[in-house]
Amino acid sequence: MSEKYTNEKYVVTWDMFHMHARKLAERLLPASQWKGIIAVSRGGLFPAAVLARELSIRHVETVCISSYDHDEQGELKVLHAAQTDGEGFIVVDDLVDTGNTAKEIRKMYPKAKFVTVFAKPAGTPLVDDYVIDIPQETWIEQPWDLGITFVPPLARK
């Protein structure tokens, strides 16, 4: 079902992310079964764009749930919700971690297919499909959260 990775930090490049998101799109074929995509903002916006392109889906909604402030998980707040029960929709997020957000998503969209690119053990039972297994204690650095910076050559240190 998925690939495994173990380490304290997992740095995802844009190329890796795109490859994994396309793999997820392949699993969602045929595209004709879907009415649209619901992206879990903000992390789900990136895989939603790839899925929308690969599956030729134009109807993209969002559900905006706030739970993280950089690396700290806090209280869930639903800021905006797509108005559907999810039937015929793919709900996509970048990651399922503790499962707190996923539980709320399942309540809101019980008939949707819920997928993520990455999954940690606590959240795995709550999604219908995912691409990469990540250990619970591993922090994922997503490419949209990173910047490119100069690193001096080792010989100069």
From Swiss-Prot:
Catalytic activity of the protein: GMP + diphosphate = guanine + 5-phospho-alpha-D-ribose 1-diphosphate; XMP + diphosphate = xanthine + 5-phospho-alpha-D-ribose 1-diphosphate; IMP + diphosphate = hypoxanthine + 5-phospho-alpha-D-ribose 1-diphosphate
Lineage, uppermost ranks: Bacteria, Pseudomonadati, Pseudomonadota, Gammaproteobacteria, Pasteurellales
MF (Gene Ontology): guanine phosphoribosyltransferase activity; hypoxanthine phosphoribosyltransferase activity; magnesium ion binding; xanthine phosphoribosyltransferase activity
Protein family membership: Belongs to the purine/pyrimidine phosphoribosyltransferase family. XGPT subfamily.
Protein name: Xanthine-guanine phosphoribosyltransferase
Enzyme Commission number(s): 2.4.2.-, 2.4.2.22
Function of the protein: Purine salvage pathway enzyme that catalyzes the transfer of the ribosyl-5-phosphate group from 5-phospho-alpha-D-ribose 1-diphosphate (PRPP) to the N9 position of the 6-oxopurines guanine and xanthine to form the corresponding ribonucleotides GMP (guanosine 5'-monophosphate) and XMP (xanthosine 5'-monophosphate), with the release of PPi. To a lesser extent, also acts on hypoxanthine.
Quaternary structure annotation from Swiss-Prot or TrEMBL: Homotetramer.
Organism this protein belongs to: Actinobacillus pleuropneumoniae serotype 5b (strain L20)
Residue positions binding guanine: 97, 140
EC supergroup of this enzyme: transferase
Cofactors (names): Mg(2+)
Residues that bind GMP: 97-101, 139-140
PROSITE patterns in UniProt: PUR_PYR_PR_TRANSFER
Binding site for 5-phospho-alpha-D-ribose 1-diphosphate: 42-43, 93-101
Main location as per UniProt: membrane
An example Gene Ontology CC term for this record: plasma membrane
Binding site for xanthine: 97, 140
